[in-house]
């Protein structure tokens, strides 16, 4: 697993990785000016947030045809269609881990999610039309 990004919890995350003996399996890459090569190479994109407005990185992963797992934060249902172009998992650690594990154990599901991402139109035109309709 590769973690891209940075934040105040990094020391705690490093500690948890060490406590679990996962230093060889979980690599913290830190901030990347160009994360797209990593996203393109990944099998799965996970956004384990407690809150998000509109997570641009979720959409970027979908545009790259990657299955996406996000936690059930307040706006998660607006980010993806659960089971169609991604999966929404519980926000707690155990529920999130169980949701990821279930997806990884299902060999047919990840390719189907990827295919759905590739087929879906993620352009902003539909959102812009809704916005203009609100002003009428």
Give residue spans per PLM region.
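Short acidic/histidine- and often glycine-rich active-site loop of Leloir-type glycosyltransferases
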Residues: 60, 73-83, 87-88
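A short, well-ordered alpha-helix in the C-terminal region of glycosyltransferases
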Residues: 109-123
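C-terminal alpha-helical cap of glycosyltransferases
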Residues: 124-136
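Glycosyltransferase donor-sugar binding loop
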Residues: 1-12
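Nucleotide-activated donor-binding/catalytic signature segment of Leloir-type glycosyltransferases, i.e.
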Residues: 14-30
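Short hydrophobic beta-strand element within catalytic cores of glycosyltransferases
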Residues: 67-71
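Aromatic "clamp/platform" in nucleotide-sugar-dependent glycosyltransferases that forms part
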Residues: 31, 50
